[in-house]
Amino acid sequence: NVTYDYNTINRTVTININQPGKAFKFPLSIDVYEDFGKNSHNVWVEGAQSSFTFPFSKLPKLINIDAKHVLLAEISDKKTLENYLYQFNNAPHYLDRRLALEEIVKEQKTNKEAYETVIKAFNDPYYEIKVFALENIDLFQKYNKKDAIVKIENLAQNDKNTLVKAAAISVLGKLIDPIYKPLFERGMNNESFAVIGSSLTSLYQIDKSSALNKLNSLTIDTKESLSDAITTIYISENDKTNLPFIAKHVLNGMFLTQNPRTQQLYGEAFKWIAESDNKEAISNLTDDFV
């Protein structure tokens, strides 16, 4: 646990490190950011309680604990949104931006700078941050979404990373706009299963008939590679003729996703299987349990 005591008269900040449970001795890197840049400090933490005092010229914009990201420890550090915004824009490492973005996305509904920072993350050099930003962008808040959509369209069409492209297609699919139908249909011809899956799901949102025709034309092996997307469509269609296929994948949707809507959808399908006399479906479900 990390807390801060600021002395504005002496212009110092004291950083208090509290180790609950067993205490360890370890080196710790601390970066203190002010308007002119950062001061880096390397200290040793010893015992359950340790404190370190550093001077500052102006109140720090950010204090970054474990700045080198080498500790295998959970750090509880109460930062403000302003701290996280500064961290995303100024701290040098991938983890700095990723950890900051995880907090920033929570505030985008009510804070314009937070929303604009999520959009800025679309340009990050790391594809993982791009994907996280796309998966968490909120296009249904009060701020102008036009610029965001233009950037997402560009990623969906041109990004070299297929996971980024797939995530961008999924975002556009949530808009349920027929203008994107050609994009989704082209995505069905991509070599990446991630892109095909997101394109199929997005196409289903705007043209169920076309999506089902595409789905039915797929080979068995391809369907298995697109199991998440296809299982969701089968369940949404209340298609019990494909109960054996659904049974192979229903547990993944129930337990390996954090999406409550998906969990509920797959939970209903589980009931179908449990109440059915479809021996193949029950066998597939049992095999998946083992």
Specify the residue positions occupied by each region the protein language model found:
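Non-catalytic accessory/interaction domains
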Residues: N1-L139, Y143-N144, K160-N161, K165, ...
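Generic serine detector
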Residues: S29, S40, S50-S51, S57, ...
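Generic preference for flexible, low-structure residues
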Residues: D31-Y33, E46-A48, K79-L81, Q87-A91, ...
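Structural detector for internal amphipathic alpha-helices that build alpha-solenoid repeat scaffolds
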Residues: H69-A73, L95-K109, K120, K130-Y143, ...
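Amphipathic alpha-helical scaffolding segments comprising HEAT/armadillo-like alpha-solenoid repeats
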Residues: D77-Q87, T110-F122, K142-Q157, D177-N189, ...
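Short inter-helical turns and helix N-cap capping residues of alpha-solenoid HEAT/ARM repeat scaffolds
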Residues: P92-H93, P125-Y126, K160-N161, E191-S192, ...
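Non-catalytic carbohydrate-binding regions of carbohydrate-active enzymes
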Residues: M254-L265, L285
